Amino acid sequence: AKILWKIGDLIDANIDELAELETLDQGKPLGVGRWAEIPGAAEQFRYFAGLCTKLESSVIPSSIGYQPAGKRIHSYTLKEPIGVVAAITPWNSPLILNAMKLAPALCVGCSVILKPAEDTSLTAIRLGELCIEAGLPAGVLNIVTGYGHEVGQALAEHNGVDKISFTGSTQTG
């Protein structure tokens, strides 16, 4: 939780640089980055920093009337990391969309391979640097750049990827 909160703080502390990178990368007006996109990305990390301290496993008594052989049935939910998440993001709002995939996965303890859109990777690379500065351990976040039909497809087909979080075009599928 502390690392996620720190990432949010570092995003805020670097708002001008990140807004400029969004403008250079995507053409977004500086003002939009400064008043909406960059603060929104910081808030994603803070929201999940708060949430990850509240996630718990639980046992829920069953409300099923018929119990085979007279046994009581309980449902058990186990909150644990799913493993490696491949997060593939589009070009149109790079930093906030990267944050919306990265923060929840880190919150629940997953490692992430972040593949930003090939046209807008500057803020993703800088976000990776800020994550390291915040104390995220090496190897928890890996950023790979390249074309979707090459890198994205390789991630989607890789046996070491346990979950794919994808936002993109209908052309991709």
Segments (PLM) and residue ranges:
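N-terminal Rossmann NAD(P)-binding subdomain characteristic of aldehyde/semialdehyde dehydrogenases
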Residues: K2-N98, L102
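Rossmann-like NAD(P) dinucleotide-binding subdomain of oxidoreductase/dehydrogenase enzymes
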Residues: E56-G173
